[in-house]
Amino acid sequence: MVRVLSAGHVNWDVTLRVDRLPEADGEASIRSQRQSGGGSAANVAAALAGLEVDAGLIGSVGDDDNGVLARRDLESAGVDLEGVRIVEAGQTAVKYLLVDDDGEVAVLGNDGVNEAVGPEEIDERRIRNADHVHLTSQRPDTAAAIARTANEAGVTVSFDPGRRLGDRDYGEALAAADVLFANDRELAALLEDEYEYVGSDFDDRIVAVKHGSDGAEVHTPTGSYVHPGFDVDAVDTAGAGDAFAAGFIATWLTDGDVERALEYANACGALTAGREGARSAPTADAVAAFLSERFD
């Protein structure tokens, strides 16, 4: 079985279904409330486990009740938590996700002890023994150290820096990544508003660009592919991008077929958007059934 480590944030999410996302001085009605695990790295790890990948996690939580809930949720998903640091007297990051009727999301939250793992806390042995490492938003020095260790060991690296890409210096981790994930806004920051893959600093590796309900595209040194996505009724888009990344990684590591990985990733993202909660990625059987219904 393929072994993948995800590194980055581990959150506890409170999802509030609202009638609309309020503007400044506005108000919205809460229709329902639920709690679940969250955090991009944790979401990817849980999604990979659901896709029958041996998934581990590098991150940190507090020793509070939310940390217990976050770890319990990941353990039940089948994620190896050996690399998760428990910070004494620390507060686990909590995110409040406001989700409107169209499934669009706004996020409020605190980082808590999310970035307590520094380069000196990394277990290099676990990285060297992995088949792949997936980086998400985290301390730039930690991301760089993990990527550097993986590169030295011949372990492939993917990176989804997320919304903080323009605010933090991820240069070393970006340079070390074999696969990059970004949405349209992040791509603009990545390519400095040029939107051109060829001739950019990243045209020697795989770049997957997520377009939400409009699907995604992937660029490689040997060609580009576009997938229009799947038509689903979006309920909650939180975690859909993480499910996309997990689906792409799981498929690409299995057979190296980038076009097939793009299709599979879109299916994972669509199925996640059709369900509530950031931790709602599908199982391998669910993805297989979804694709079979559309192409058989």
UniProtKB/Swiss-Prot annotation:
GO terms for biological process: phosphate-containing compound metabolic process. Keywords: ATP-binding, Carbohydrate metabolism, Kinase, Magnesium, Nucleotide-binding, Transferase. Requires salt for kinase activity. 2.0 M is the optimal KCl concentration. Its EC number is 2.7.1.239. Its cofactor is Mg(2+). It catalyses: alpha-D-ribose 1-phosphate + ATP = alpha-D-ribose 1,5-bisphosphate + ADP + H(+). The keyword Iron-sulfur does not apply. The active site is at D242. It holds the Pfam family PfkB. The keyword Phosphoprotein does not apply. One of its GO terms (molecular function) is kinase activity. It comes from the Archaea. Kinase involved in the non-carboxylating pentose bisphosphate pathway, a nucleoside degradation pathway present in some halophilic archaea. Catalyzes the ATP-dependent phosphorylation of ribose 1-phosphate (R1P) to ribose 1,5-bisphosphate (R15P). Shows weak activity towards various other phosphate acceptors, such as xylulose, 2'-deoxyguanosine and D-ribulose. ATP is the most preferred phosphate donor, followed by CTP and GTP. Belongs to the carbohydrate kinase PfkB family. This is ATP-dependent ribose-1-phosphate kinase. The lineage of its organism: Archaea, Methanobacteriati, Methanobacteriota, Stenosarchaea group, Halobacteria.
